[in-house]
């Protein structure tokens, strides 16, 4: 059977593993075996491919009997695993109760296995001071505007350090440029006080006493205003419900946390019967949602007993003297970080580098001490790890992709925005990971039509997201006295949606799930072909960019209006703001430069990672670039990889406040305080001298500059088109190009001529009917030209079958390199 015949056969009824899956909010452990079987059977009959299940708190319920960890919940979990496995469906555990983080009933805030933070107490010194050092108030209510979370404080704190600094005038947020934010500090009128960086003095060695009883005798060296920063470590006390006892959030930075987590799963959860069911299901998963780790202390810093030691080992200097300049407040997500103190202007770059080094170290520890050992444990037990890896916390966005089996994004925090989905596409494609999304959450439950959600899925497919997990499913049955029509909500009444049997649309779900399954089936075949990789390091990516729905006068704007008429649908992409490549039909995505140092980043046939995305060119635009990555760029460019240096580019910093980061000169310094700026400058000078490298000072010239370097899209439009997004898979003799008319509210019918290298028969997928129809095409040299007409919001997949073409008419090297068969891993 030929590839095209194999494709036709699979499209008639796509296998269950390609169907959309569901997040299932369970009313604690209240279900009976019969109701669980009923719900799973209904989901299966409607065509859903799997159930990601979690416990949600119910009012007036005895959590000691029904909460996470109880016998009732444990029994229900085993039943779900058994029943989904029996139907060929996947199942996904969560790493604790509800969705927010990994949490356990076996730890307390005073244990190293529980989440820890660094707290600070201030003392102003005029002249001399002598006596006990102030301690933090563990049970004090946090006075900031931060997101409210539940906590039960611990009883102990550990002395960490005391640092003195001369504090001078305040600055406004606009005066300080940094990777987080300035403003909202501890100075008068909310101004941010300025520290004389040269005055920072580590006094820890002068402290006497033991445990929590510490004292210091010290005299200020001059008459300036001096402040002592007294740092203490304690547990965050963050808890999660529902729990049969109390579940505390674990430590994500030190091995104590993951060791406690794996011990609990090994010794308590994974019984012999459960292990047998897991072994029978090839798609058993552990799912980790967006990282909702909260702090209550005044320093706002994630910490642990070994963080300072790890910082020194990894960054090469002592973090202690710099701690006052790391003190922060984070009103919501990491993007809202506000440093309470700024350094003087003369040391601005130095301070920014230290701040980068701190969050880079946090990322290292999250990867090494949480994700990698957890993944190893899960894989050893037949479970894959799927995770929303970084956003919301100051971890680098893409680097943790190396430590999971599946990389996930979501629609709630990123909206229906193609650039947001490109942010994590790079590591997914480079590593060959399944790229998925938690899709459908808004704050307008039961208010939006089905087309709205179809358009989110269509946008995500254009970035290579080929696994849709719907948000979500809830049984109509719920706790007596708290469940109202049209049924149990589970994920709070305001958050959409309920893709379950209560919906009138459920009548056509079998047709819909097959249609989505066909699209996902085709777009997982073979290898992705992405034209351009954009190097981007980000610890504070705005993951609230899909949630800010307020107009200039402070009035609420409906989600459907922002999704359908604003941002990308008003020609405003957030991170790569020039639209020239997109309008040409080219594809591009982002990843951290450290990926260039990985074994996947090999060059063959003029493309980077030919067994993955096959990038034909790389773009460098941010001011900060590591010296090792720059040296690797020189090697790659010498071997023929095209590199474009773009100066003067800007990217979104925070949508809510309208802030953008301006990159005056690309790769002009290293990110951290590593003393390698001169080494970077030398490497960039060498890079600029190479024939495969170009440099521009206007982002709008990107497409022309890449064409001048000899880049031709894997597929491209015969003429620019502002209505259509594309995504390509190379599948042996077949090339699949997904096309999507994304202006579903404001556009008109459009026809685009799609140029695909190679000569062959063109087909258009009818994803609703499961058929491939012959499509009109013509040849132009060695290229097939396929006209595609799309209505607003319509999607199509064009498949070019080159199996019957003469060898010389097949896809050429370069634009057609890197073919791979359908047996490739999903990415």
Functional labels for PLM-detected ranges:
Residues 1-272, 276-283, 808-822:
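Mature N-terminal, pre-catalytic/accessory segment of carbohydrate-active enzymes
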